[in-house]
Amino acid sequence: MSLSRHDIRKIAFQTLFALGSNPDANSEDIYQELLDEDNNDSDLSYLNELVDGVLDHQSEIDMEITKYLRKNWNIGRLNKTDLIILRIAIFEIKYSDVASKIAVNEAVELAKEFSDDKSYKFVNAILQNLI
């Protein structure tokens, strides 16, 4: 069964959250817990692209986020959920062929799903300034 891109982004978010909480964790083990056995290779390929891409470009992505934070704010003050959602969106905007508007919309939807009511507005504001 093929997953939607939104579902793949949700799994990427959950994987990155788990890896951030436990650096010794293995992304493949997390995938096995989150994915059905009958997912196709293109799903796994895009999931790997997102997770590995965010991890590989994390320092550059974090520098982008920092540019749009208020004075006296740093990346460490951000809610972990919002930070991971921003990292996924910025990876898609900067390093993949996903249209910026789609990446922003998907990030806002993830924030609505996984964070509080104010977070989606914050995520949207940061990403709108970036694009």
From Swiss-Prot:
<dbReference type="InterPro" id="IPR035926">
    <property type="entry name" value="NusB-like_sf"/>
</dbReference>
<dbReference type="InterPro" id="IPR011605">
    <property type="entry name" value="NusB_fam"/>
</dbReference>
<keyword id="KW-0889">Transcription antitermination</keyword>
<dbReference type="InterPro" id="IPR006027">
    <property type="entry name" value="NusB_RsmB_TIM44"/>
</dbReference>
<comment type="similarity">
    <text>Belongs to the NusB family.</text>
</comment>
<dbReference type="GO" id="GO:0006353">
    <property type="term" value="P:DNA-templated transcription termination"/>
</dbReference>
<dbReference type="GO" id="GO:0003723">
    <property type="term" value="F:RNA binding"/>
</dbReference>
<dbReference type="GO" id="GO:0031564">
    <property type="term" value="P:transcription antitermination"/>
</dbReference>
<dbReference type="Pfam" id="PF01029">
    <property type="entry name" value="NusB"/>
</dbReference>
<protein>
    <recommendedName>
        <fullName>Transcription antitermination protein NusB</fullName>
    </recommendedName>
</protein>
<keyword id="KW-0804">Transcription</keyword>
<keyword id="KW-0694">RNA-binding</keyword>
<dbReference type="GO" id="GO:0005829">
    <property type="term" value="C:cytosol"/>
</dbReference>
<keyword id="KW-0805">Transcription regulation</keyword>
<comment type="function">
    <text>Involved in transcription antitermination. Required for transcription of ribosomal RNA (rRNA) genes. Binds specifically to the boxA antiterminator sequence of the ribosomal RNA (rrn) operons.</text>
</comment>
